[in-house]
Design a protein with these regions (language model features):
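Short alpha-helix in the alpha/beta-hydrolase fold that links the catalytic acid
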Residues: 191, 205-214
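Conserved HGGG/HGGXW glycine-rich cap/lid loop of the alpha/beta-hydrolase fold
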Residues: 7-63
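Short beta-strand/loop motif that positions the catalytic acidic residue
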Residues: 189, 195-197
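Acidic catalytic loop of the alpha/beta-hydrolase fold
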Residues: 200-204, 229
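Active-site loop/oxyanion-hole signature of alpha/beta-hydrolase fold enzymes
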Residues: 37, 52-95, 241
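Conserved hydrolase catalytic core segment
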Residues: 90-129
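Catalytic active-site module of serine/aspartate enzymes centered on a nucleophile-bearing elbow/loop
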Residues: 219-220, 225-253
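Helix-rich cap/lid subdomain of alpha/beta-hydrolase
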Residues: 117-182
Length: 253
């Protein structure tokens, strides 16, 4: 996996394909190659250059040790812009899952001239007590599914428990501060946007994709009626076809 220096760290990233640049941002604690294993080769084979990084403090982009200050989503957005600039991409599409959806939407709002299209799923523009309760229900790794725990343990080893506890504490602090992650910025997103959601997502209630959809003018919303949090993995064929059609649709004049 190649790496490139950006302010504060050496960021590792997966790169595949040739064509239009497509940045894929993983979820909390996730890695680009792991979270998007069903998307990277698929899109790379269809005239996209996929860039799927390990965000600051995650996966192979360590050090630094990951922390969660009040601006961590915005810091991650700045890192992603720095990565794409270092790779020579001035304009690019962005796909984000979960925390990656939050980062991606912030990017599209902050520098709309750089983000050509936006695909987001599993994110939320604000926090409620329901999400905090859901996080605390899985605060102990023993409460995770064996598969999820095994996947993350392979990346972080014994550091996983403390890292995840710090993450949940960071979410609690954001909620205590009012819980607005980027809801106030949604109106600044001007690029074509596709919002996807699993109707049975146990972590992100349906009010969140609805709020993002309503907040971004002209955005589209697609619901996977039986989907949970990992719609891009569980329904990879349908997900890939839907997002590919959106990303390649000619812009309206």
């Amino acid at each position: 996996m190649p790496a490139i220096g950006i302010p504060g760290l050496s960021m590792h990233y997966e790169s595949a394909g040739k064509g239009a640049p497509l940045l894929m941002i993983p979820g909390a604690l996730g890695t680009g190659a792991g979270d998007f294993s069903a998307q990277i080769p698929w899109f790379a084979a269809r005239r996209f250059q996929v860039i799927a990084p390990d965000p600051r403090g995650y996966g192979q982009s360590r050090p630094p040790q990951r922390d969660f200050p009040s601006n961590f989503y915005y810091r991650d957005a700045a890192d992603m812009f720095a990565l794409m600039a270092a790779l020579g991409h001035d304009r690019f599409a962005v796909m984000g899952w979960s925390d990656g959806a939050n980062i991606a939407t912030i990017m599209a709002a902050q520098q709309p001239e750089k983000v050509t299209r936006l695909v987001v799923f599993g994110g939320q523009s604000f926090l409620t007590a329901e999400e905090i309760a859901a996080f605390n229900a899985i605060r102990k790794i023993s409460a995770w599914s064996p598969r999820a725990a095994e996947t993350m343990r392979a990346v972080y080893g014994e550091e996983l428990d403390e890292l995840w506890d710090r993450y949940v504490a960071g979410q609690e602090a954001l909620f205590a501060a009012g819980g607005d992650l980027y809801r106030r910025l949604l109106a600044k997103v001007t690029c074509p946007t596709l919002v996807l959601h699993g109707a049975k997502d146990p972590l992100v209630p349906g009010l969140h994709p609805e709020a993002i959809h309503r907040g971004i003018a002209g955005s589209r919303l697609h619901i996977f009626s039986e989907g949970k949090h990992n719609i891009h993995q569980r329904y990879a064929d349908d997900f890939n076809a839907l997002t590919f059609a959106f990303l390649t649709q000619p812009e309206r004049s």
